[in-house]
């Protein structure tokens, strides 16, 4: 409820990215995702990753741009998406490199970077957008399981539930 009062595409970009990503991974109800989408639309936030995630849930959503608002570190989403169209295995390899070498370093300017070193409350570092991209692009993420920052369990939270209903 407070997000509409404070959110701007520049001010809280990563928070919106995380909310959309978590919503995709956990199969949030469309009305919850729609609230985020409406905020993006109202603020005219043009971002490739937002568009990619939104189109997964709302296929009629028009892509607004082929750019990301923050190229460093997020331009990787464009690369992974383009690779997935040609070779899904290569897309996973590129995502793996991003998780291992680029994601954490690419966020060194954010306030939560290095929180674990200061003895304050810390709930981990998670690259939620990587899990959402895996789901949206239909990638096999078995090689990403156990990698730092990759939310494998969140991507697969309902695998066993689905098996129960299909058995």
Roles of regions detected by a PLM:
Residues 1-111:
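Eukaryote-skewed repeat-based solenoidal scaffolds used as protein-protein interaction platforms
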Residues 10, 66, 121, 158-160:
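Detector for Asparagine
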Residues 32-42, 142-160:
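Short alpha-helical "patches" and their helix-cap loops
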Residues 98-154:
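C-terminal structured interaction module
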Residues 165-166:
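Conserved small/polar residues in nucleotide/adenosyl-binding loops
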């Amino acid at each position: 409820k407070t997000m509409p009062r404070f959110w701007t595409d520049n001010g809280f970009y990563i928070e919106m990215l995380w909310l959309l990503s978590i919503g995709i991974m956990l199969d949030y109800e469309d009305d919850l995702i729609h609230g985020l989408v409406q905020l993006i639309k109202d603020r005219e936030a043009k971002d490739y990753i937002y568009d990619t995630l939104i189109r997964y849930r709302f296929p009629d959503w028009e892509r607004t741009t082929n750019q990301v608002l923050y190229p460093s570190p997020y331009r990787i989403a464009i690369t992974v998406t383009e690779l997935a169209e040609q070779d899904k295995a290569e897309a996973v390899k590129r995502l793996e490199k991003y998780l291992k070498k680029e994601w954490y370093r690419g966020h060194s300017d954010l306030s939560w970077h290095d929180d674990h070193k200061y003895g304050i409350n810390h709930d981990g570092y998670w690259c939620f957008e990587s899990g959402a991209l895996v789901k949206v692009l239909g990638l096999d993420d078995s090689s990403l399981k156990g990698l730092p920052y990759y939310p494998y369990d969140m991507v697969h939270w309902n695998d066993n539930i689905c098996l129960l209903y299909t058995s």
